[in-house]
Every structure is written in structure tokens, then in C-alpha cells.
Amino acid sequence: MITMKNILKLRATGLLLLLLLMISVLGNGIGQAMAADRVYLDITAPETRKIKVAVPWFTNTGEGGMKARIAKDIADTVAKALKFHGIISIIPTSEYKGRQTADWAKLGADYAVLGSYKMFPKKIKLEIRLLDVAENNIILGKSYKGSMSQQNPMIFKFCDAAIKSLTGTEGIASSRIAFVSYEKRTKDVFMTDILGRRIRQVTRHNNLVVSPRFTRDGNFLSYSSYHSGSQKLYITDLRQAKITKSLSRRKGMNLAPTWAPDGKSCILTLSKYGAPDLFRINQQGKILEQLTSRAGVNVSPTYSADGRHIVFVSDRSGRPQLYLMELETKQTKRLTYDGRENAEPNWSPVENKIAYSSLRDGLYQIFTLDPFSAAPPKQLTSDLTRHESPVWSPDGNQILFTQYDGRRQQIYAIMKNGSYQRRVFSFPGSQSSARWAR
């Protein structure tokens, strides 16, 4: 028979079981919760504290004893590559004299990178581990062996794996940055790593080269050159440096393509019929379709990650503004209304966010917007210099842009929340028009 007394007894028993279950879950999860406190789901939120990492000097496990310069150089490269991601704070080695036996918890470290190296004739072996300080547990271990010229790429691979262990997203230490360098009245395209350690000259036209663009897989790079007397579009196979071919040699403009996600076609600006319009061409340069046919200028297309939309710049309203086009229907709508001019859009590879430059109070500043949202654009830069040519990092967390201080152009980076703005390279001459690929 069900009575009020039995009901109360059942309720009490249920509450007790629920309480015991909660205690059990909490007891088993305390260690996990402590570790979870250091894994930040929104790693670019303004209020998120940076992950504190110690990178002591590497130890020598081979013959010849400790080689201080090598030990310090390897650790320094690891530290700089991790810090570049904008979510890592490196504890200075001066606080623990670079020793691997330091009390990491006392130093306030969340993690420590512990490594060793061994020299071979013309080769080096690296053993690198990532220690979770709170758990006193190695959460990542990697071993690499290669030529001395492969030392930095091996370090970058570890850093990418370490960032993935901490955030769930692969790092960008192994990514490549292409840019235009201006020196001695010529512009050519160069390519380098995130730290500017290894530089490769991609073009040698001894003329003006503009608008480098990676294909989505990063294996090819297209650019426009004036070396033949007029602007032509070329593409080079980065895996085979000498393989370069003409992609479009049409009369007039052949400019700034955006490559489709499948890499089989690109959209660029051609002026073969007079006005600069957007066309889609295949890998052989054949025109597949014309996308715009209105008076005015239509330039700077950028593909969405799914390949269904583009954002581009048009002055059809009187001044340059951003427009969104659905490629299947060709439906187009204006996106920007604030700012005297809005130009150079670049679509994030991981989300619906457009980075672009906007002319405000006489200066170009970097903004971002969601093309499918009514939310207002977000301003990232505000200092009294000129900011142009924004481009997203492969992980969608950072933006490179060109800053002009009235004397020279330099490449800067900033997190997508507007934090950690800094100059990226210290090369001679001027650098601009950066592009980023894995």
C-alpha cells in the first residue's frame, strides 16, 4: 500500500542516492577539473588568462657534454613558437636558471617542456615531452631525428602537437607565410616560417609582383606580375620551385584570385571587356563563368570555407564597400555601411568571419564582421597608422596585416579578439600583402 510515509521514505532514499552519486562524480572528477581549468575552450576570449609554460634548456644525451648554445637555442625556438600562438605565456629561464629540475608548481607553471638532444654526423635527434605540472604527468612525448636544417621544422611539429594537446586544435607553428618584399625598386614574393628563420624567394622577375595567393592545400601560389610589360597572372608549384606557368594573360587586369576549397578553380578580376569584373576560371585558365557585369569596379573576392559564397569589393554604390554573393543564385547584398571605404576582405577558414580594412577618420583600421549576422562589425586596431591587407591564420585565431607608418610597410599580427598586436618580422626593406597557409 502506498502511503505518505512510504512516499517520503522513497524521496529520502532517492535524495541520498543522488547525493552519494554527486559525491562520487565530484571525487573522481576533482583531478580532471583541475586540469580542465587550464584548457580554455574559447582561447581568444579577452578575459582568458594565458597558459603559463616553462621551457628549460635542453640536455645533451650524447658525447661531448653540454653544449650551452645548442641547448639554449633549441629551447628558445620552442618558447617563441609556442608564444606566437597568443595563448601561451613563457616563464623566463632567468627565474630558474634554465634547469630542468626546477619546482614548476612553485614557479606558477601550468606546463613544462622538457627536452634533450643528441648530435650525430650531420644529424640531430630531439626528444621532447610536455609535462602537466598539476598532474605531474607527461601528456605528450615526441622523438625526431633529421638533418641540422630540419631542426626548426621538427621543433615546429612538436609545438603544433603541444597546442593540440592543450586546446584540441592543431597549432600553426609549421605554417608558412608568403609576402611581397619591396627593395631597390622591385617587388618579389618571398615565403618564410612564423619566426622568419628560413626565407625562400618565390619569384625572381626583378619587376613588380603583387597579390600572392595560396591555393587551399598550400601547394601552389598564384601572383600577378608586370615583368612582361602588363599585368599577367601566374601560378607556381611550391613543391617544384622551377615549375611556373601563366594562368591568365588577358588584356587589362588579371588580379587577386581566391581559390575554391577544392582547388579546381578560382575567382579573379578581369577587365577584358572594359570594366573590372569577377570571373571564375579553371586551373588551365579557361573562363567558366562571369559573376558580375555591372558598372564600376568589382575586385578582391574571398571564398567562404564551404565554397558556397564569396565576399568582394565593389564601388557600385559610389565608394568601395563589401558585398556578399551566393554563388548558386548570384544573389548579392551589401554588407558594409559604416566607414568611408571598406576593402580587402578575407574570409576565415574556420568560421563565418570576414576580416577587412575600413577607412575611418582618415586611417585604415582592421575590422571583422559576420556576413550572415546583424551584429555590428568589431574594430581590432586603433593606433594612428595605416592597417591594410588582413589575412586569417590557418586556425582562424589570428590575423596578419600590413602596417604603414609613413616610411615603410611592415607585417603585424593580432588575435581575433584584438589582443597581442605585434610586429612579426624584422626584415630589411618593406613587406606587405601577407598570405598564410599550413
Swiss-Prot record:
The Tol-Pal system is composed of five core proteins: the inner membrane proteins TolA, TolQ and TolR, the periplasmic protein TolB and the outer membrane protein Pal. They form a network linking the inner and outer membranes and the peptidoglycan layer. The gene is tolB. HAMAP family: TolB (MF_00671). Its main location: periplasm. It is found in: Periplasm. One of its GO terms (biological process) is protein import. GO terms for cellular component: periplasmic space. Residues 1-35 form the signal peptide. Part of the Tol-Pal system, which plays a role in outer membrane invagination during cell division and is important for maintaining outer membrane integrity. Keywords: Cell cycle, Cell division, Periplasm, Signal. Belongs to the TolB family. This is Tol-Pal system protein TolB.
